[in-house]
Amino acid sequence: MTAKPLVRPGLAAYFIPVTRHDHHLHQGESLREAAKSRLTQRGEQWTDMRQAVFDALANFDKPASAYDIAEGVSKALGRRVAANSVYRILDLFVQSNLAMRVESANAYVANQHPGCLHDCIFLICDDCGQTTHIDDDSLSSGVREAAAKSGFSASRPVIEVRGKCGDCN
């Protein structure tokens, strides 16, 4: 399978489709509307602050920390926004599949296909920080099966592979 670049300009990530269903990748206003729809379907409100946090997150080229996002929201709103407020919103976004957390970097990326549920698999470049999100259900199901064989119930496998991207190689 070949990687197709995400459609949002400047995003240094690629998406590898899963064969069992189609993904609809969103960008710009479409991404915001898909996120809003997903959140409201879950019975949550799409507040101005949540929109500001989502917009700031979606504008980053690389995984962003809550502090980076708080700084972006503060500039956009013209007032200081605390990182702890952003963390709470990011937690909700992760639970709602609007964002994915890059555990090793304590950073987040917007999910460009919030209607699809997959375990997180990230390829992280040690040189430039480019983070590629891929969906490979065969890999993540293997992790879940191995965990189950050990009597462990995996709630959310996260796989992060560190190395060098094609640009830095």
Where does each model-flagged region fall?
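DNA-recognition alpha helix
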Residues: 65-79
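Non-DNA-binding regulatory cores of transcription-related proteins
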Residues: 94-169
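Short alpha-helical segments that sit at the start of domains
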Residues: 21-54
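Short, positively charged and aromatic/hydrophobic N-terminal segments
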Residues: 9-10, 14-17
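Short capping segments at the starts of secondary-structure elements
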Residues: 46-48, 59-65
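Basic amphipathic alpha-helical segments that dock to polyanions
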Residues: 86-96
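Short amphipathic alpha-helical elements of helix-turn-helix/winged-helix folds
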Residues: 38, 55-60, 72
